[in-house]
Structure formats: structure tokens, C-alpha cells
């Protein structure tokens, strides 16, 4: 009986050891959207790994019935995580995180059904939020923001639609005061444009049409007095 138990334990140990092995990605092939081990007919289930030339792990993922399932990791050669994401039935789902070599968070990008959905956030290596990019159905859409990488203060914000600037865009002074406000249509300046002194007083204003100044452009001094007025047509001064 004792010998039988020992034999059974050895068999179980061997099976567990085999099951824990990671299949190297070089031995995998894709047929359609499914992963297979070369020469096998059944979609693969288990862990897959990719290594650096020195043998250290570069990437690690889990496959279920031929599709990515669960956490997917990419590593720097120093062993620290470079990126991590989550998959459900072969599609990215949830927040993908990317890291600097130091281990500090570099970005957070939300996914839904393999498409970017929501606000992606980007950070400096010092941990300061430097940009927020909104996505809808994998296309930039919404209010995008850029921050100063040293102070974290808002520098620029823009309305995005269909992947390009559509609507108001604003630039700010380091103090946080509004510097300019310009309107875009399909990524081309179109509509009113205003520029301000840091004290909030209007410095200049005009109108754009299809990317060209069109109409009366006016500049002011810091007391609100008109300094100059020039009329434009299709970007050219009308005299």
C-alpha cells in the first residue's frame, strides 16, 4: 500500500509539473483568431511566455480554448512590469496600465470589447498627470486636457470629435489664467478666436473661416483701448 501511494504521488507530481509549464510563444501559431501549438489540432489552453535572449521573461499570458483570457503582462529586462492588461474571450477588457522602467505608472487606458472607451490618462515619471484623452468606440471624442509636467496645472484643453479637433480649444498661462480660445471645425480653425492678457483683459479677437482670418481683427491694450483694427478676406488684408 505504501509503495502504491508513493507511485500515485509521483504520477500526480509529474502531471502537476507538466501542467504548470509555460509554452514558449515561438511554438505557437494562430489560425484565425485562435492560438494553437504547432502541429496540434486542438486550440491551446494554458500559459504562454516570451523570453529575452538572456532567458528572462519578456511577456506572459494565459490562453483558454485558443483565446487570451485574464491578465497579460509585459516585462522590462530588469524584471519590472512594463505593461499589464486584461482579456475576456480574446478581447481587451478593463484598464491597460503601462509603466516606466522605474516602476512608476506611465499610462492608464480603458478598454471595452477590445476598443478604447473612456478617458485615458498619461503621467510623467514624477507621477504628475500630464494628459487626459477621451475615447468613444476607439476614437478620440470629448474634452481632452494637457497639463504642465512639472506643476500639474492645466495648459491646454480641446474638444474632440471623430478623432480630430471639433469645437472650442483653450490655452492657459502658467498661472492658470486663460490665454486664448479658438474654435475648430474638422481640425481646421473656423469661427471666433480670442486672446487675453494674463490679467484677463482681451488682447485680440477675430474670426477664422476654413483656417484663414476672415473679417475684422482687433487688438487692444491692457486697458481695453483699441490699438488696431484690420479687415481680412480669406486670410488677406483688405485695404
Label every model-predicted segment.
Residues 7-15:
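Bacterial N-terminal signal peptides
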Residues 15-239:
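Glycine/tyrosine- and acidic-biased, solvent-exposed loop/turn segments at the edges of beta-strands
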Amino acid at each position: 500500500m505504501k509503495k502504491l501511494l508513493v507511485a500515485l504521488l509521483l504520477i500526480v507530481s509529474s502531471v502537476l509539473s507538466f501542467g504548470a509549464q509555460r509554452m514558449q510563444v515561438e511554438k505557437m501559431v494562430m489560425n484565425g483568431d485562435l492560438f494553437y501549438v504547432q502541429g496540434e489540432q486542438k486550440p491551446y489552453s494554458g500559459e504562454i511566455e516570451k523570453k529575452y535572449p538572456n532567458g528572462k521573461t519578456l511577456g506572459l499570458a494565459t490562453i483558454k480554448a485558443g483565446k487570451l483570457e485574464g491578465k497579460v503582462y509585459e516585462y522590462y529586462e530588469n524584471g519590472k512590469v512594463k505593461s499589464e492588461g486584461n482579456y475576456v474571450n480574446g478581447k481587451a477588457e478593463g484598464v491597460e496600465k503601462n509603466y516606466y522602467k522605474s516602476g512608476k505608472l506611465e499610462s492608464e487606458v480603458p478598454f471595452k470589447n477590445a476598443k478604447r472607451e473612456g478617458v485615458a490618462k498619461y503621467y510623467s515619471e514624477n507621477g504628475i498627470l500630464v494628459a487626459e484623452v477621451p475615447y468613444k468606440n476607439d476614437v478620440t471624442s470629448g474634452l481632452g486636457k494637457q497639463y504642465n509636467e512639472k506643476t500639474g496645472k492645466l495648459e491646454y484643453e480641446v474638444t474632440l470629435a471623430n478623432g480630430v479637433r471639433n469645437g472650442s480649444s483653450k490655452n492657459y498661462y502658467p498661472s492658470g489664467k486663460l490665454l486664448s480660445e479658438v474654435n475648430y471645425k474638422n481640425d481646421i480653425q473656423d469661427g471666433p478666436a480670442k486672446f487675453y492678457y494674463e490679467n484677463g483683459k482681451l488682447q485680440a479677437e477675430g474670426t477664422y473661416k476654413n483656417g484663414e482670418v476672415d473679417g475684422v481683427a482687433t487688438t487692444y491694450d491692457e486697458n481695453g483701448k483699441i490699438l488696431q483694427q484690420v479687415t481680412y478676406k480669406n486670410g488677406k488684408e483688405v485695404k
